Amino acid sequence: MKINKWLSLTSVSAVMAVLVFCSNKQLNGNEPLLIRLTDVMSTEHYSPYKLNDQFSEMVFNNVLKNLDDDKHFFTQGDIDKLSVFKKSIDDQLKVGRYDFLDSAWSILMVRLNTIEPMIEKELSKPLNYKSNNNYVVTEKVLKYKPNIAALEQDWKNWLQYQTIDRLYRKIEDQENVKQKKDSAVIKILPFDTLEFKARNETLKFCKDWFKRWRKMDQKDKLSLYANCITEVYDPHSNYFPPEDKANFDISMTGKLEGIGATLSEKDGYVKVERIVPGSASARQGELKAGDLILKVAQGAADAVDIVDMKLDDAIQLIRGKKGTEVRLTVKKPDGTIHVIPIVREVVVIEESYARSAIVNFKGKRFGLIQLPSFYADFAAQGRGRHSSEDIRIELEKLKMEKVDGIVMDLRNNGGGSLADAIDMSGLFIEEGPIVQVKDPSQRIQQAPDPDSEIQYAGPLVILTNTYSASASEILAAALQDYQRAVIVGTNTTFGKGTVQTMMPLPSGKSPIFPKGYGEVKVTIQKFYRINGGTTQLYGVVPDVILPDIYDGIEQGEKEMDYHMPYDKIPAAEYKLFKNKNRADIVKSAIVRTQKNEYYKLISKRATELAKMRNSYTYCLNLDGYKSQQKQIKEQDKYFRDYKYKRVIDTAFALPIDLDEVKNDELKKAQKLDWIKRYMKDAGLDESIQILYDWSERI
């Protein structure tokens, strides 16, 4: 099966990547990025806005939300001052100006400089742990504080809440140590010491937070502003400066050129969190998890100090072309300093690719396929990996193992390539349409299975959850409409029913963007099920719904600002898969889950969490806070103490996969570790029972 020509949901398409050049506009020293960006969005988006006062007000509100969603920094007076821009942002964008952003940013920096000393003073001495005040955490719309005094009081309450929570957990941890009689190993600290540590942790959290704001340069600020503009068209249209585009490509291909280390920022240092097995760093052997990177040199060139550098900027220095050398000056946990030379290579992130295992249950063997995303390497021009081809390979391997059914796990799979979703769906049916697509002109096209073969015709379950989105929803919806698979999962999938493509912004550069303007991911189409419905907003409702502890909390597309509406189109013509026992199999599964004690507990806990999430008042008195936490613990004790009993017998890696890595212990461990996580997985257990019922009725 070859990859067809249909667009990807979130990747570059050679067919549709349109270059939209500006006319001979005079930029007058303003930022050309904004002109180019709004030109592309206005001409290429599925549902473009006119640059008018209404559009201006949406951008105004979105910028404020991105800068201060929790109303921690701006007062109502600040908003009143900024409101002079509410209906003029559209006029500014037409000439590349960003006066509103600069004004909002200036006020934000003033507020940081006002609030930080107040925080330092407030946390310089023990807090009042006998306070009668409360701190209200709510999901309802927050209001801006009327003045600085009210803002500071809100901060003091927030600081008290944060510190009491940290202090409570330290006291609890210490009590647990006492009960386990480990006090001889771990020194028991007095209350004053614990309180001091809690205050310092709160202070450090705030300082790190403010530091991240202050590290943002003009490019960062304009990139944020550009995304505030694209987001009002819809939440999946985004701007990518050149550096972010590189990260996006990694997420789509599962590959990058670099040293093979996962990095984080800690106290101004770049810290090594993990070494990727089989990578350049792993083979070189000196760089270890826990090392702090102090300097970076390109080959024999002078080293650049990266302490206190933004993590993204440091990563750009460390990454580089395959075959080039980078020299890292690192500080080891024992304090010694080492210079480590590493020759960069292509790093393959194996856990981002499809993988399979065998599950034994009641004397039968079933296949498990995990697919983290619908990845596709379009830039490799036919030589790169595609998720649909990898799934075809996994299916062939499982067929060689003579499995009695297959479950494909799409939980937390946020989507990816539309082309691969179409081709992958076609692996399970002989022929027919997979998805319908509507463009801005309202023209509807059907995307068919590209061949008449069926790679796997046996029992099939698709496992989903709320974070199965986009391409995942296309595959699940198509196989549900054909009645080819039984869909099992939480009450619905994410609800993203739109198609995006990456469009390069017109060539050029500016002092702020010396490497060029990057690209914009633009929504250009909506997709629809073959039954005429759409997954937009409401997702795919499983045939067998499994209770989830977050059922009472709204999630997914419908909770996102500026989402596109739900609608329908006429159904396509298609023939149902022949499975006369499907309805009975689904009915049996529903009855089984309704009787399941574990799912009854989950439903009960979901109701409790929903009440807490909507609004909760925390006591700012330490004794009162302890009582509240005790009550919360007692509420879910029944859930925490429940001993889940797995249903499946065993799960293990395919012999052919283990044979490939028999001489590499790290890669062998990788092949085995991911399977262990499924050994107490209620979703997998129910899926396997459905497959068993299905296989018994063939």
Positions of PLM-derived features:
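Acidic/histidine-rich, surface-exposed loop or edge segments in extracytoplasmic proteins
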Residues: 34-46, 84-88, 204-208, 372-375, ...
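Bacterial Sec-dependent signal peptides at the C-terminal "C-region" and cleavage site
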Residues: 4-30
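Conserved functional hotspot residues or short segments at active or partner-binding sites
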Residues: 122, 145, 153, 168-184, ...
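Polar, glycine-rich mid-to-C-terminal structural blocks
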Residues: 471, 483, 490-555
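Charged, amphipathic alpha-helical regulatory modules used
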Residues: 24-130
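Extended, domain-scale alpha-helical bundle/helix-rich regions
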Residues: 120-258, 262, 267
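Cleft-lining beta-strand/loop regions that shape enzyme active-site pockets
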Residues: 22-25, 42-52, 211-220, 234-258, ...
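PDZ/PDZ-like domain segments forming the peptide/carboxylate-binding groove
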Residues: 66, 87, 106, 110-117, ...
